[in-house]
């Protein structure tokens, strides 16, 4: 797990003085489907290797601020919060347009496109 966490830390490097956390607080039925609710906040402390390991083990949810203090950015993410989400349509569009995106389901039921 340590080597995997180090790789994630390298690929998703970002702001070193702060990071986000997200906690699921419940879910609600909407006209468009089920949406999980949560609370996100920013902690003014570094994102450590131990926190990455906890995140990858599914114990906590973390968020990386991609923009660094030196105003560089190594990666980006599109957050799709459309409920109910049509993942087949999203995947078909990515393939049809040959977009260099990797889709990942989110804990709230949406999709992140990296």
Language-model features: where?
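DNA replication initiation on ssDNA origins
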Residues: 1-75, 83-88
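Short, well-ordered alpha-helical packing segments
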Residues: 9, 91-95, 114
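Catalytic micro-motifs at enzyme active sites that drive phosphoryl/nucleotidyl and oxygen chemistry
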Residues: 62-68, 91-92, 98-107
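Histidine-centered divalent-metal-coordination microenvironment in nucleic-acid enzymes
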Residues: 77-78, 100-114
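A short, contiguous, amphipathic alpha-helix enriched in charged residues
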Residues: 80-96
């Amino acid at each position: 797990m340590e080597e995997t966490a180090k790789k994630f830390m390298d690929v998703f490097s970002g702001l070193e003085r702060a990071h986000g956390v997200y906690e699921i607080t419940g879910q609600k039925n909407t006209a468009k489907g089920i949406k999980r609710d949560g609370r996100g906040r920013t902690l003014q402390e570094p994102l450590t290797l131990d926190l990455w390991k906890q995140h990858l083990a599914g114990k906590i949810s973390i968020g990386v601020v991609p923009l660094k203090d030196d105003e560089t950015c190594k990666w980006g993410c599109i957050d799709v919060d459309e409920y109910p989400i049509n993942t087949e349509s999203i995947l078909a569009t990515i393939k049809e347009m040959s977009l260099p995106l990797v889709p990942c389901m989110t804990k709230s039921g949406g999709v992140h496109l990296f």
